[in-house]
A protein has these predicted regions:
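Short alpha-helical catalytic segment bearing the HExxH-like zincin motif
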Residues: 26-34
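Histidine-centered, transition-metal-coordinating active-site segments
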Residues: 1-25, 39, 43-303
Length: 303
């Protein structure tokens, strides 16, 4: 286990973009892509009802960047305008649509895999990263991909292995329950919305502990005690009595990376195709993941 913050993710994303582009604007777009992310990160997407795309917390990104005068002056001194770095979606190396591989996706899955299920070690990460290169996809756009089919397969398989954790009701219950705790705290004015951007998650949890101990609001206390004390999530087709139950579909995070074919020449660049077109096992693995569905409900007894 190790500490992994949104800042570290953003710096890592920027470093990957720089490694493959040496472009300041793309790199800064990667660095600032999550500045509007509040405490508890994607939990707030659940609170906003955005479980399928989990992008609602990005909505204020451009606004926050464009309102920062100090940042504007610093960028201008380097000949860069804020509009050139306020949306990393315009740079396909930084971000692209699933199932493509981007710096953002490449970065978050390595530490996530290390912490959630220990699927990577540093030697594996170094081996796989050394096989990543900028390739051209079917739309003629640059995209991160692999020089070696085996490396692409190993990365895809472990990516899906980690992503499967997020498809289970255990994760859905945890995310939605914490989202409801935050919502109740805001409804009761136990915290203010701006504190999600000014107070650390550790400090907020300590505040929640104290609020629950003092039982300042019965509904908040019940939600929080359940979150703190739940042991086993029941997988059911119907909601259970005397239980907190969740039924929600969530974003399916996976990659079907490009693989370079041959070496190419100056007049005829090497082509790249999706891994699933080259490897039947990869195709089956992806299809199995996409077809997976947990039971309709995940439930935990109220505490």
């Amino acid at each position: 286990r190790f500490y992994y913050s949104r800042l570290e993710h953003s710096v890592g994303t920027a470093l990957i973009v720089w490694n493959f582009t040496h472009d300041k604007k793309q790199t800064l777009a990667g660095l600032f892509h999550d500045v509007s992310t509040p405490a508890f990160s994607h939990v707030i997407d659940f609170r906003n009802g955005d479980t399928l795309t989990q992008e609602s917390t990005e909505l204020n990104n451009q606004k926050m960047i464009n309102e920062d005068l100090e940042l504007s002056e610093l960028l201008f001194s380097h000949g860069i305008y804020k509009y050139e770095i306020d949306d990393y979606h315009r740079y396909p190396i930084a971000d692209n649509n699933i199932p493509g591989l981007s710096a953002d996706r490449l970065e978050y899955m390595f530490p996530s895999g290390c912490s959630l299920d220990a699927v990577w070690n540093m030697d594996e990460i170094e081996r796989l990263y050394s096989q990543v290169a900028v390739l051209e996809n079917a739309d003629g756009l640059p995209e991160l991909g692999f020089l070696d089919q085996q490396a692409a397969f190993d990365y895809m398989r472990k990516f899906i292995e980690v992503s499967m954790i997020l498809q289970h009701n255990e994760d859905k219950v945890s995310m939605q329950l914490l989202a409801d705790i935050v919502s109740r705290a805001l409804e009761c004015k136990l915290i203010a919305e701006e504190q999600l951007f000014t107070i650390s998650e550790k400090a907020l949890v300590e505040k929640f502990d104290a609020l629950a101990k003092d039982n300042v609001d019965e509904s908040f206390t019940r939600l929080y005690h359940t979150f703190r004390n739940m042991k086993v999530v029941q997988h059911t087709q119907e909601p259970l009595p005397d239980s907190y139950c969740v039924s929600v579909s969530v974003k399916k995070r996976y990659v079907n990376p490009l693989v370079k074919l041959g070496n190419g020449t100056s007049s005829s660049p090497a082509k790249a195709v999706r891994l699933s077109e080259l490897n039947k096992e990869a195709d089956s693995c992806i299809k199995e993941f996409l077809s997976f569905a947990d039971t309709q409900f995940g439930c935990v007894p109220w505490c």
